[in-house]
Amino acid sequence: MARAFLVVMDSVGIGGAPDAAHYFNGDVPDTGANTLGHIRAACDAGQANDGRSGALQLPNLARLGLWHAEALAVGEPVPDHPAHGQWGVATEVSRGKDTPTGHWELAGLPVPWDWTYFPDTNPSFPVEISNAVQVAAGTDGILGNCHASGTRIIAELGEAHMRTGWPICYTSADSVFQIAAHEESFGLKRLYQLCETMAPMLHDMHVGRIIARPFIGQPGAFERTVNRKDYAVQPPGPIVMDWVKDAGGHVYGVGKIGDIFSMQGIDEVHKGSDADLMKHLSNLVDGAKDGSLTFANFVEFDSLFGHRRDVAGYARHLEWFDAAIGQLFDR
């Protein structure tokens, strides 16, 4: 019996959707978005030579039809050489550009409501949310309360967090409420409990995810860990994982898939860094059950390189992924 493997390269976009002008990063609309194409152009221009050099090399993904799909998405002529895989592009019908929206649609369930987004102001959160965090955390206040990059706000407020014990709360252009805390001084279990306590209130407001963002280290050398955990709204209807299970199949989640879908329809989850996830995926290629679905998300494109606008790092990760996934194709 056949098996299916659905692999998401998180944030690796190949062109803006028709409604891109309705979405923003700060004051800049998403019109003309094309993460992959822009990284390739930067590589061609010699602007991504840190730890690598030259043109972007993705032979295995290209063989599947990656550049054919990218050309179609941005309205350019597709390459003359044939692809050896089936390729295409899709446009979301839901309103939103965040993780739950995209993944739910991949799983067959458009989002039936508009998500709640917090304004890019200071403070960003209503008083009732800030007060609820303080009560749940047992603190006299919170830090942040704004739009921010996770790595930057941890660098800026991590020392104050360790001194006061106040959680760092922030958001972004997505429908998220993120809480960062030090794994040792605040406690990882305590951070998870805080997020679990806040999740029902925020989910009722149609905030898509509450994200625990643990970090370690000392001032000047803070580092986020792989112990991130997402508390997402439960899908309001059946998804492809449910259909697989109804047919008697087994569903494997790799990466943050379990968190994104609140474990709906998922039998087991394998987590870790992207390097760990590739090993898990390799093992599942060898050992996943007949009739099963493996749904994987490789998040470090976004978390380590996209948010930081690290073009060279993103290109390195793309080339690493291409080489690693190519070994699986050969099996």
Protein language model annotation of sequence segments:
Residues 181-182, 188-255:
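Extended, H/D-rich, highly charged conserved domains that either
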Residues 1-5:
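Extreme N-terminal starter segment of soluble prokaryotic enzymes
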Residues 253-281:
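Functional beta-strand-loop-alpha-helix junction segments that form "active/interaction loops"
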Residues 165-168, 207-210, 281-302:
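Active-site regions of oxyanion-processing enzymes, predominantly non-cytosolic
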Residues 282, 302-331:
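A long, amphipathic alpha-helix that forms part
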Residues 218-221, 260-263, 302-307:
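Short acidic/His/Gly/Ser-rich catalytic and metal-binding motifs that mark active-site loops
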Residues 11-165, 170-182, 186, 213, ...:
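Active-site nucleophile/metal-coordination loop of metallo-enzymes that catalyze phosphate/sulfate
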Residues 18-20, 180, 263-266, 305-311:
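Short acidic, glycine/proline-rich loop/turn micro-motifs
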